[in-house]
């Protein structure tokens, strides 16, 4: 086994493992992100309306938009 062959094999396997690691990391991250979105969905106007109705308050459109703005600024 020559030195050139050994170096080429090491470099080739390193690149291969790097690519495989990147693909695995992509899918793991994607799965975790989807799980987080499923457990904690983003709040929308419909959810805010439902929250106000549960509190027994009839919210105006301006109040709902104000709550949405405050939620976005809090991020």
From Swiss-Prot:
In what way does this protein cross or attach to the membrane?
Answer: Single-pass membrane protein
| The entry's keywords | Membrane, Transmembrane, Transmembrane helix
> Transmembrane: is it a keyword of this entry?
yes
Under Pfam families, the record lists:
UPF0154
One GO cellular component this record assigns the protein to is: membrane
- Which regions span the lipid bilayer? 8-28
InterPro entries named among the record's database cross-references: UPF0154
Tell where it localizes. Membrane
Please report which protein family the annotation says this sequence is part of. Answer: Belongs to the UPF0154 family.
Could you tell me what this protein is called?
A: UPF0154 protein MYPU_1460
Species: Mycoplasmopsis pulmonis (strain UAB CTIP)
């Amino acid at each position: 086994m020559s030195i050139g062959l050994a170096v080429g094999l090491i470099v080739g396997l390193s690149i291969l493992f790097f690519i495989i690691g990147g693909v695995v990391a992509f899918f793991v991250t994607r799965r975790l992100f989807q799980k987080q979105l499923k457990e904690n969905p983003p709040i929308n106007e419909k959810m805010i309306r439902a929250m106000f109705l549960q509190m027994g308050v009839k919210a105006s459109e301006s109040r709902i938009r104000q709550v949405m703005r405050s939620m976005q600024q809090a991020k």
